[in-house]
């Protein structure tokens, strides 16, 4: 049997002794040239294909948790036997597309990218970058209007949304040029302008020209979805895209939706001076999160003055001149919400309508998403998909990760499976929400014996000195191993804290590991240690930094 090179992520290694145990376990399965690294949480070795499961069993028997194996490229460069005009043809030009193009180009492949609109995809053009800079502007304006400190007299005039939008557009243009457009020439792959449509599984047509490739990546992203509410198509509603192009601050804004886009943009406009009503069908915001998280952000947004309506049944929407009326029913009572603008933030739909995927034998799901396996292959094994078009976690860092996976798999550089178990997510409200790993409910559904700690934000010294104490830290732990399997935070700068929690979850740190570590005083990161201490102690009875 031929020996192949493998890499396996391994949880639970904490020292050089652990490396020795893992090495011994692998060698007992017949592995050669084993290199175990506890800092990286991985082992690389040579082994025949038929012994890989035995190797993983040995690792488990030694007390560690092996992940999915990845075959590693040989030391020889890949010899491309081109079957078409390109080795890899990418449809789309966002995070997944550029990651795949760069990886493929670095390994000698001939690559082309097809884009029908603006280069750069959602994140830099109409998503992360423009929304977060506008959120920051709103946050500063809101703090000037309502700061929590006595003795400070701060105020603000009317927000000039036209100037803010112009500044935002300048930033977007700069980042699009530097992080996307300039890289096309830097790496030397082809950019083809136009709409791509499959002719067959080897050919697409762009502007009437047929182009062939050995493999394809569909990375066309997603667009705002519009709910089926009577009258919605007859009113001038906003989406997350058009809301960021407004030149005047609306007096009244009604937001349909209960997710991160609804909360972020709703709070942004509130901070700029708009009267905001958030409406959602569910009984609570962020219904997929643990109740403590939903309750904390609900309390904070309500304290700030946003109007939240849950359990909504939408009856119809009507345009009345410059005003829009939303007819709803809540607990059997009919209401009418009047607004100058209506923002629809009810999710996103994949951009697959014009690709003619049937001609290439590519199957899609109920919402039009491209269906893929663990290698990101579609139902046609020469065609891959990555990023938002698959309706997986809709983060640019996930898309970029998946693009790299596709480049490896499509070009035969290494056979890699996707692993999305440890993807952190952040909602950039104030306070922000950050989460990684399993919720309490998810952990129970997976059969874990679960224990949790819930630390109110007023137990975190940084929150006290900020005079902003609405929030919570929640940790989810496997009671049998004491390992952290989930962390969920509502606090200022929660997104800056969650990376530490991500490493803790990914590499199997225990409660004791967290409580025995140093946490800088008067930082939000200290909340992680305090939440870990809460499993065994009442932290309100501890002096500063005592554990």
Swiss-Prot record:
Pfam families: HMA, Pyr_redox_2, Pyr_redox_dim. Binds 1 FAD per subunit. One of its GO terms (molecular function) is oxidoreductase activity, acting on a sulfur group of donors, NAD(P) as acceptor. Keywords: Disulfide bond, FAD, Flavoprotein, Mercuric resistance, Mercury, Metal-binding, NADP, Oxidoreductase, Plasmid, Redox-active center. It catalyses: Hg + NADP(+) + H(+) = Hg(2+) + NADPH. A metal cation binds at residues 15, 18. Its EC number is 1.16.1.1. Disulfide bonds join 123-128. FAD binds at residues 97, 117, 122, 132, 196, 388, 396. One of its GO terms (biological process) is detoxification of mercury ion. Its cofactor is FAD. It comes from the Bacteria. Belongs to the class-I pyridine nucleotide-disulfide oxidoreductase family. Resistance to Hg(2+) in bacteria appears to be governed by a specialized system which includes mercuric reductase. MerA protein is responsible for volatilizing mercury as Hg(0). The active site is a redox-active disulfide bond. This is Mercuric reductase. It comes from Staphylococcus aureus. The gene is merA.
